[in-house]
Amino acid sequence: MKRPDYRTLQALDAVIRERGFERAAQKLCITQSAVSQRIKQLENMFGQPLLVRTVPPRPTEQGQKLLALLRQVELLEEEWLGDEQTGSTPLLLSLAVNADSLATWLLPALAPVLADSPIRLNLQVEDETRTQERLRRGEVVGAVSIQHQALPSCLVDKLGALDYLFVSSKPFAEKYFPNGVTRSALLKAPVVAFDHLDDMHQAFLQQNFDLPPGSVPCHIVNSSEAFVQLARQGTTCCMIPHLQIEKELTSGELIDLTPGLFQRRMLYWHRFAPESRMMRKVTDALLDYGHKVLRQD
């Protein structure tokens, strides 16, 4: 059985995290040549490349598996060392989360853990359709995803759903939808997407108004909070989680353009198995809070 030296795994991890050999060497306080030698040693052990030497470097499929192994070992070390780590560097927890969860329920859910435990969060924001891939690649130890099926050697639990409403300001609705939200009116009304892969509004408009993808003008803005601001200032109509705009809907600052029509995204919490004590705390906090504020039906 091949048993890698974890110093070599840490070198591989550093090259990926620091996006290059030079910064990885600085992070590890060794020479760049030593980093290269450690990775070469690891590649010789497994008889295949573990890095695609692009800019920035990225792991091969086998490299991803080894990084996932390293994440698990780091968490299990925390489990075994327990109180002996008191006063040492806080444990780094890298989690992949979607922007809308981060803007609504995730931080309040994690607040008790952050208050009571010596951890450093590294929250990597990704679309909920792609967060699980970061777990697969070993970049994170947990992920909030819409995928319901667990990866090999991982656990999954249902968190609950975010319901997305198609909203705008009242002046925007009066300008673009004087006769109601119709297919022809939507062709002229600007919407907003998080990035070029964000297809939520396209799916909603296609399903309910038979509008093909790309048929409406669309801004690209990488911020959930900015969606709310754009809608409030009358710039766009957009899909926003109901949980994020309860006050604006109650006050009338924003209006639901299509009452009874919405997009539901069920969210799941994925993480490596077995769970360390710290990850169990994170899991309990996310599930407890998620079950309170997210839709469970």
Curated annotation (Swiss-Prot):
Controls the transcription of genes involved in arginine and lysine metabolism. CDD domains: PBP2_IciA_ArgP (cd08428). InterPro entries: ArgP, ArgP_gammaproteobact, LTTR, LysR_subst-bd, Tscrpt_reg_HTH_LysR, WH-like_DNA-bd_sf, WH_DNA-bd_sf. Keywords: DNA-binding, Transcription, Transcription regulation. It comes from Escherichia coli O7:K1 (strain IAI39 / ExPEC). This is HTH-type transcriptional regulator ArgP. Residues 21-40 bind DNA. Gene3D superfamilies: 3.40.190.290, Winged helix-like DNA-binding domain superfamily/Winged helix DNA-binding domain. It comes from the Bacteria. Belongs to the LysR transcriptional regulatory family. GO terms for molecular function: DNA binding; DNA-binding transcription factor activity. The keyword Transcription regulation applies. PANTHER family: HTH-TYPE TRANSCRIPTIONAL REGULATOR ARGP (PTHR30579:SF2), TRANSCRIPTIONAL REGULATOR (PTHR30579). Pfam families: HTH_1 (PF00126), LysR_substrate (PF03466).
